[in-house]
From Swiss-Prot:
Species per Swiss-Prot/TrEMBL record: Homo sapiens (Human)
Pathway: Lipid metabolism; fatty acid beta-oxidation
Residues reported to bind CoA: K406, K410, N411, K412, M413, L414, H415, P416, D417
This protein's name: Peroxisomal carnitine O-octanoyltransferase
Function statement: Beta-oxidation of fatty acids. The highest activity concerns the C6 to C10 chain length substrate. Converts the end product of pristanic acid beta oxidation, 4,8-dimethylnonanoyl-CoA, to its corresponding carnitine ester.
Amino acid sequence: MENQLAKSTEERTFQYQDSLPSLPVPSLEESLKKYLESVKPFANQEEYKKTEEIVQKFQSGIGEKLHQKLLERAKGKRNWLEEWWLNVAYLDVRIPSQLNVNFAGPAAHFEHYWPPKEGTQLERGSITLWHNLNYWQLLRKEKVPVHKVGNTPLDMNQFRMLFSTCKVPGITRDSIMNYFRTESEGRSPNHIVVLCRGRAFVFDVIHEGCLVTPPELLRQLTYIHKKCHSEPDGPGIAALTSEERTRWAKAREYLIGLDPENLALLEKIQSSLLVYSMEDSSPHVTPEDYSEIIAAILIGDPTVRWGDKSYNLISFSNGVFGCNCDHAPFDAMIMVNISYYVDEKIFQNEGRWKGSEKVRDIPLPEELIFIVDEKVLNDINQAKAQYLREASDLQIAAYAFTSFGKKLTKNKMLHPDTFIQLALQLAYYRLHGHPGCCYETAMTRHFYHGRTETMRSCTVEAVRWCQSMQDPSVNLRERQQKMLQAFAKHNKMMKDCSAGKGFDRHLLGLLLIAKEEGLPVPELFTDPLFSKSGGGGNFVLSTSLVGYLRVQGVVVPMVHNGYGFFYHIRDDRFVVACSAWKSCPETDAEKLVQLTFCAFHDMIQLMNSTHL
C-alpha cells in the first residue's frame, strides 16, 4: 500500500470515473438459460419441466417486452441498476437494518502489536483514530490509489461514501446523506462524534489548519471517558437507530418536533466523519478464535453505535477494535481497504506513536445534549429491548483454519475462493442432506458505479461432486474429476458475473419494470422454484470473500433457516465467520464451520491421492 501511495501522485482517486463503461444489459436468452441451469439442483423432473415452460412463455411473451423497456432505460443511464438496487436492497427495507443489514468486522491489530490488554483502550484508540483520519485526508486529496484489475481501473465512487455519510430513516423509504467533498470540490465536515455510556460528544479533528495528533486525540478521548465514568449514563439516543425503520422515522420526527435543537444535533452526527464508539466490554480474541470479538462488534451495546452511520469505529476496554457499517452506501471491500491501510500503519510503527508529545490548546469536546421527554425515553427502551432480544438469538462461529491456505491450493492449481465455496457446499450437504442455494458476491466495479452481482455457487456440477463424496461406490479418480468440473463451472460463472453477464440483477430489473408499468407480476417470479433456488432474497447461504489481507467481516443470514458466511484467505490459513439464528432448529453455525474445515482436508486429500 505504501508503494502504491508513493506512486499515487500520478493518478487521482476519482480521475477515471467519467471514462468507465456503462453497466450493460445482458441478453435475455442468455440470462434465462443461466437461470434455468441454476434451478436444476432444487427441482425434480416434473418441477423443472414446469419451470422450463414458464421460462419459455416468459421469453417469447412479456419477458421480451420488459427487456426492450429495460434496454430503453439503460440508454439514458450510465448504470441502469444503481438507483433501483439502492432502493430495493437497502432503502425500502423496513426491518431493523443495524442488525439485519449492516456488516461488521474486527481490526487485525490484535494479531501483532496490540493483543488484548486492559488499560490500553484510550491510548491505542488515539493512534488508530489518527491513522483513520490520515486516510480521510488522503481521500480528500484524491491520493488513495485507484483500484485496478491488471491495467483496467475500477469504479471508486463508493469511497466517497466512507466518511461523513449517514442513512436517514423515512416512513416508507430511507435516504442517504453524504457530506463528503474532496479538497478540489470545497469544504467537508471535519468533526467526529464519540459515543460513550449513552452520551454523545463532538470535536473537530483539524486545529489551526492541521490534523490533531494522537496525544491531542488522547486528551479528547480521556476527557470524554472520565466524564462518562464519573457521571450518570446518558439516555442512549443512538439505540433508536437499531429500531424497525418506520418506527425510527416516526421517533425521529417526534424528537425533532420536541425541540428544533434536536435536529441540529442529529445533523452533527449525520455529517460527522465517523462515529467513534467506546464500549465497556472486553471480548476474548486470539488469532485462531474470532467468535466473541465479532459478536461484540456486530451485536454490542446499541447506545454506543449509530446504526445508520457509514462508519462506526468501535473500541473495547481491552484495546481491541472493530467497525460496524451501514451497508447501503458501500460494500465491504471499501472498508477492507481502509482497515488494511490502518493495520499496516500500526504494524510499521510497532503499535506506537513516534511523533511529538506536544498537546496544543484545542477546545474540549462538546456534549450533544438532546431534549427528551417520557415518550422519547420510552421509544429508546423499546428499541433497546427489541434489539437485545433479536441480537441474543444470533449464533456466531468464527475461526481460523491453520493447516494450510492459499499457497497449497494454488500449488494444486485450485482457485482458493472456489476451493472455499465448494467446501462449504459439501459441508452444507453433509449437515443438511440436500444442496443449499448459495449467494456469493461478485464484483461489478469494472462498470460506472458498479457494485455487485449474485453468483449462484450451488451448481449442478457442485451437487454431483457432493453426492459422489457421500457415495462409497464412487472411486477417488471419479470424485476428483467431478470436483474439477465443479471448479471449472464456478470459475467461469464468476468471470461472467464480474463482466456484467450475471442474471439475477437482470431479472430484478425486469420485475421492477413490470411493477413500474403497473403490470401483474410475471409467473416466472411467483413460480415456487424461483424462491426455492434463492430468488427474491431467499438464499440459505449468504457468502462473500472479504479478500486476501488480514481483514475479516461478518453479516447475519439472509433467511431464518440460513447462514451468513464471510471468509478471508491468506497464504497459510483460511479465516471464516459464520452466523445463524439460534431459534432455527435446523441450523448450527459451529457444525457448519467444522464440517467446512473437514471438507478442506478431504479436498486436498483428493488431489494428493490421485497424484496430480
